[in-house]
């Protein structure tokens, strides 16, 4: 968190292009229809908002860094249906099973227990939710990333990594 607080004012200059590539890769496998409620866990400066906010009933961005949320707040001024929450991804102050789409872009390698984080994401996602998770290649092997998603009981619908610095997985909850 401290790293993101320190770099919040320059985050977009450093990472916007890389983040956009990840988001665009994910959006190729995500239906562009009406979204319902969208959650962006680890929303950072809110780069995802321009891809989903216009088609969503409401988009909620959560981040643990207050300073980076201030940058997201500026971006959210262009999107009246965006709400921001300062919270930990492992303990989100949200109801169960409400989000139709959950995005965790450049998040899980920054959490102490990625499976716990993914389980919390599943808790707030509805039964038919689309869950997008990215994992940096410098943090995970492909096999390790897939194993992590399986350990969290996520079904991988699409997986992309060509030309990216990360793996982009579009998932659903596994039926029990």
Where are these regions (language model features)?
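Conserved class I S-adenosyl-L-methionine
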Residues: 1-33, 47, 139, 165
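Class I SAM-dependent methyltransferase SAM/SAH-binding core
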Residues: 39, 45-91
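A short glycine-rich, Lys/Arg-flanked "PGG" loop and its adjoining helix->strand segment in the class I
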Residues: 115-127
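Conserved beta-strand signature within the Rossmann-like core of class I S-adenosyl-L-methionine
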Residues: 128-135
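Short alpha-helix
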Residues: 140-152, 167
